[in-house]
Amino acid sequence: MAGHSHWAQIKHKKAKVDAQKGKLFGKLIREITVATKLGGPDPNANPRLRIAIEAARKVSMPMDTIEKAIKRGTGNDKEGALEEIVYEGYGPGGTAIMVVVATDNRNKATSEVRHAFSKHGGNLGSSGCVSYLFEQKGVIEIPKEATDEEKLMEAALEAGADDVESTEDMFIVYTNPKDVYTIKDILASKGFTIESAKTSLIPTTTVEIKDVDTAKKLLNLLEHLDELDEVQEVISNFEIDKDILAALG
């Protein structure tokens, strides 16, 4: 699961910049809308929506903004309906990339994603071209600060988690997708601080990037994709040695 971890570490380092740009608000609004569309407007009956609302409140999103996003998800809104699309493609170094988009304009989204791939030495592929290299997992992120790894490991496995992984500043708890929100609630009830909880695509195998130039091209592509307005998540199956990451600054 190193591909997820490396990009997650890089993403956490730029998270504050995203928040300043207002991009985080946009992502959360779209997540609330899509979650409502797929699972209904009642957060008590729709765990994905409940988690999205919790994340929005955590960054002080106004309640009327949240309610408007829910309304759009039910279709009782004048704005166009959002749909969730997953694009698949190839990146530098033979890497596989999945891009999750929430959009009301499929043609525009496809054009923007294709342009990003082409600009940075990648190729947008057809549906199914790389998805077999990933599996759906529940992903719970817990800040390392003030978290006892042994206690977390014990509590997570007891709650039914598959594995716990350590990154630079986070513990990542992996679960069966259908259990992620239940396990998140169990861990929260035991006093663990939850940074985020969601379902995500996780690589089953990784591709090692062995040179600085390829690593730079790949990370530029992933960052370009992630900065597109309608992109919700970018997942890749790369693994980069820490010395190469250090050389990139």
UniProtKB/Swiss-Prot annotation:
One of its GO terms (biological process) is regulation of DNA-templated transcription. GO terms for cellular component: cytosol. GO terms for molecular function: DNA binding. It comes from the Bacteria. InterPro entries: Integrase-like_N, TACO1_YebC-like_2nd/3rd_dom, TACO1_YebC_N, Transcrip_reg_TACO1-like, Transcrip_reg_TACO1-like_dom3, YebC-like. Gene3D superfamilies: 1.10.10.200, 3.30.70.980. HAMAP family: Transcrip_reg_TACO1 (MF_00693). This is Probable transcriptional regulatory protein HY04AAS1_0501. It comes from Hydrogenobaculum sp. (strain Y04AAS1).
